[in-house]
Regions:
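Conserved small/polar residues in nucleotide/adenosyl-binding loops
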Residues: 103-105
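Active-site glycine-rich loops that stabilize anionic/oxyanionic intermediates
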Residues: 38-41
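Alpha/beta-hydrolase active-site loop
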Residues: 82-101
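N-terminal cap/lid segment of alpha/beta-hydrolase-fold proteins
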Residues: 1-25
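Alpha/beta-hydrolase fold active-site loops
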Residues: 30-33
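Conserved alpha/beta-hydrolase
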Residues: 52-75
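Short N-terminal helix/helix-N-cap motif within the alpha/beta-hydrolase-1
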Residues: 43-47, 70
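Surface-exposed, active-site-proximal loop segments in enzymatic domains
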Residues: 73-83
Length: 105
């Protein structure tokens, strides 16, 4: 089965970084899942899971949250979401990720 892999970046609502995103899309997907990884994680840990889902007709999309994975250009920023209430940037970034994925799926 052919799997289309798309990567790119979008500006985080935090203004602190550009979030790296990933999309694994099978031919004629019957469903899509958006993954939101945990603390100290990053999307690429889930490549095997993405391929499993694609083999079963399900697309997987997600991004490295602010302060995580390839969304960090300075290692001192690992785990940093921003000032008080910074977690809301992550939530808003997930909404951006959803809108972006709808263009491709």
């Amino acid at each position: 089965m052919k799997i289309t892999r798309i990567t790119g970046t979008f500006p985080s609502t935090s203004g602190l970084c550009r979030c790296r995103y990933y999309m694994y899309i099978p031919e004629n997907p019957r469903a899509a899942v958006m993954l939101s990884h945990g603390m100290c994680e990053y999307f690429q840990r889930y490549c095997g899971f993405a391929e499993f889902l694609c083999r079963n007709g399900i697309a997987l999309v997600g991004n490295d949250h602010i302060g995580h994975g390839n969304s960090v250009s300075d290692r001192d920023m690992l785990g940093y979401f921003g000032e008080a209430g910074g977690y809301m940037y992550m939530v808003k970034d997930l909404h951006r990720m959803r809108a972006l994925s709808l263009i491709h799926i």
